[in-house]
Structure formats: structure tokens, C-alpha cells
Design a protein with these regions (language model features):
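Metal-cofactor-dependent catalytic cores
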Residues: 1-67
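Short beta-strand segments
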Residues: 74-75, 135-136, 194-196
Length: 230
């Protein structure tokens, strides 16, 4: 899985991605007429430099038990993606995750576009294999609020309790909490949760659910035991 480390001679590598989306409209494509970049295999970052030769043996290293959970944050906003509005919710989520011990691998600012959101959810869950994806925005009744539908379309298992808990908590603050259509699902070992768009609502909801997420994420990843309490 992503995060696995290998040694080869003096070099130390960490897997960062499995497979790669073809960037069919990149500069290479424009010049060559086709993509010549690799699309298969695994990709790794160099943790410690060294020399690798053809035929060298790659040694799989034990995964440390204390590795931080890995997260990604996606802000959905037409105006934000066009530079017409500052994204305040995304950075707030990053701050709260980091303070709780998560490693935020990526932050994205997208328009309310179903195709773009689906592409990124699939990439982050399947190729990057992050443990948690938090989206913000697009959970209301407006015509372009498509976040829950896209989230459900990539789901392999439902995890409704998280979204239900957020609605319950929001209703203790405002009756408008019932208008949230946020979804929470699992794709593989990745938990995907839709948060509201406003910074105030993001803070209220994330403070409420964040203490319980890590255990669920670790269960999904096969890192923790059962949920039963003695």
C-alpha cells in the first residue's frame, strides 16, 4: 500500500502512488500527440538518496505502527475556483487535521463540477490511497450542489452514521441543519466525508466528529481491532 518503504543499497524509498492518470492535455501531449509518461506501476519518493543499479534487490521494510493517518481536502466552489472568493474552509480543515496529528497530502480547490470531483475522489482513494478525504461545500439544495451525489457514486460501502451525527449536532445549533445533504462513505480503505461550505459550520461539525474518525479509519485500514467496548 501507499506509505510502504523499500531499501535498495543505500537508497530509501517510500511508495506515494499506485498507477497514474494520463494527463492527455499536458505540454507533452501537445508536442508529441500522445502521452509518453508512465501510467502503470508504482511511484515513490526518495527518503534517503543513494545509487540504484539494474538488477538490484528491493527490500520491503516493516511499516512503522506510529505512521500518521493521511488525508486530503477538497473545496467545492465555483467562485473560489475562479478566484472570485477566498477559500477559508479548506485551510481551516487542514489546520484542524494537522493539529490532530493527520498528515495532509493534498488540498484541491474545484468548481462544482461532477466530473472533476469524481476524477479526484477516485485518484485520491485508489492511486494515492489516502485514509481520509474531507470535502467542503456543495451539500445544500442549490442546483449546482452535487457533492453528495458524486460521493455516493464512488462509494463501495456506506458509512451513514457520520453524516447523521453531523446533522444531529447541527440541529442543536440551528433548525437549518436539517437541510444538509452531506454523505459519508467508504471506498476501499478510504473514508470520504462531506462537510458544509461555511467556515463556521465546518468548525462546528469537524470538532464534533473528528475525535471518533481515527478509530473508524484505522478499522477500515485493518490497523485496529473491533469496536466493542468493555
Amino acid at each position: 500500500p501507499v506509505g510502504t518503504r523499500f531499501s535498495c543499497g543505500d537508497a530509501l524509498l517510500e511508495m506515494t502512488q499506485i498507477g497514474k492518470e494520463c494527463h492527455s492535455h499536458c505540454e507533452i501531449f501537445k508536442r508529441m500527440g500522445e502521452c509518453i509518461m508512465p501510467r502503470e506501476g508504482v511511484f515513490a519518493r526518495v527518503v534517503k538518496g543513494g545509487t540504484i543499479h539494474t538488477g538490484d534487490e528491493m527490500k520491503l521494510l516493516p511499516t512503522p505502527a506510529d505512521l500518521p493517518l493521511r488525508a486530503a481536502v477538497i473545496t467545492l466552489s465555483d467562485k473560489g475556483s475562479h478566484g472570485e472568493r477566498e477559500d477559508k474552509s479548506g485551510p481551516l480543515i487542514v489546520e484542524m487535521l494537522t493539529a490532530t496529528g493527520y498528515k495532509v497530502e493534498e488540498t484541491l480547490l474545484l468548481p462544482d463540477d461532477a466530473a472533476q470531483l469524481k476524477t479526484q475522489l477516485l485518484r485520491l482513494a485508489d492511486a494515492r490511497q489516502v485514509n481520509l478525504i474531507l470535502t467542503t461545500g456543495g451539500t445544500g439544495f442549490a442546483p449546482r450542489d452535487i457533492t453528495p451525489e458524486v460521493t455516493l457514486s464512488v462509494a463501495e460501502r456506506n458509512a451513514p452514521g457520520i453524516a447523521e451525527a453531523m446533522r444531529y449536532h447541527s440541529l442543536t445549533i440551528t433548525p437549518r441543519g436539517m437541510l444538509s445533504r452531506a454523505a459519508s462513505v467508504l471506498r476501499g480503505k478510504t473514508l470520504i466525508v462531506n462537510l458544509p461550505g461555511s467556515p463556521k459550520a465546518v468548525k462546528e461539525n469537524l470538532e464534533y466528529i473528528l475525535p471518533s474518525l481515527a478509530h473508524g479509519i484505522r478499522l477500515a485500514a485493518g490497523l485496529d481491532g473491533e469496536c466493542a467496548r468493555k
